[in-house]
Amino acid sequence: MKFELCAASLEAIRLAKELNFDRIELCQNLEQGGITPSNGMIEYAIAYGIDTHVLIRPRPGGFNYSEDEVEVMLRDILNCKEIGAKGIVIGVLTESGEIDREILMEFMEKAKGIEVTFHRAFDDCFDWKKSMDILIECKVNRILSSGLARNVEIGMPILHEMIEYSCGRIEIMTGGGVNAANIGRLHKELEPDAIHFSGTVKFQQDEDSLFSESVLRIDKARVQRILAASKV
């Protein structure tokens, strides 16, 4: 089983390397669910020597995108491939909550040669079995999911069904609310291909500044506790 850190800061990138994570999902603005990071941040992570999978998401909110947004996403995918990212993390749905196969295939064509993860947009899908079949047909490498629920604990029954249904045809990575209290159970009962978590805490950035913001900051001790609990 592999471990993926959701890294939204330079500190998180360095910690992932220090603690020997298998890979990172690189993003920015984790407080809004994450958006595509800057070129400088992507290049920093790659140069730091960790497998970097870049989130391709032009804005917060849902996953039904306009033509202009799709154009930006295609440019971002090509850019990530050209500068050496190991993979990309994407998700695109129709207005009715189905995977947009046509746009997904455009993304897959641009991403040819690197890995592709379909993120938790999957948890917004109307029919998860049909959606998984589409992703398998489109040769997506893995799905990140909380089992169609707010968090992995609530979604464990569906995650179990997903892993059985996938039958090794696509990787299933669990994520969403993973912590030291539940990771051991996830590992033991589900045996997913990978577990994804951020290990962050709320923090008031630059609290004496006029521009102070509440952010999610990586917490080394919390990350270490989660990793340790996975081995129990």
What are these regions (language model features)?
Residues F3-A7, I24-L26, T52-I56, I88-I90, ...:
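Hydrophobic faces of well-ordered beta-strands that scaffold small-molecule active sites
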Residues L19-I24, Y48-D51, I83-G87, K110-I114, ...:
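Glycine-enriched alpha-helix->loop->beta-strand junction motifs that scaffold or abut catalytic
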Residues E11, L30-I50, D68-E71, L93-K112, ...:
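Active-site-adjacent beta->alpha loops and helix N-cap segments on the catalytic face
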Residues I56-R59, F63:
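Glycine-rich nucleotide/cofactor/substrate-binding loop typically near the N-terminus or early
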Residues E11-L15, N64-I77, D123-C138, M162-E164, ...:
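Catalytic cores of alpha/beta
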Residues P60, G84, C167-V232:
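C-terminal alpha-helical cap/extension of soluble enzyme domains
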Residues M1-I24, N29-T36:
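N-terminal pre-domain/capping segments
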Residues E25-I35, N79, I83-E95, V140-E153, ...:
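Glycine-rich phosphate-binding active-site loops on the catalytic face of alpha/beta enzymes
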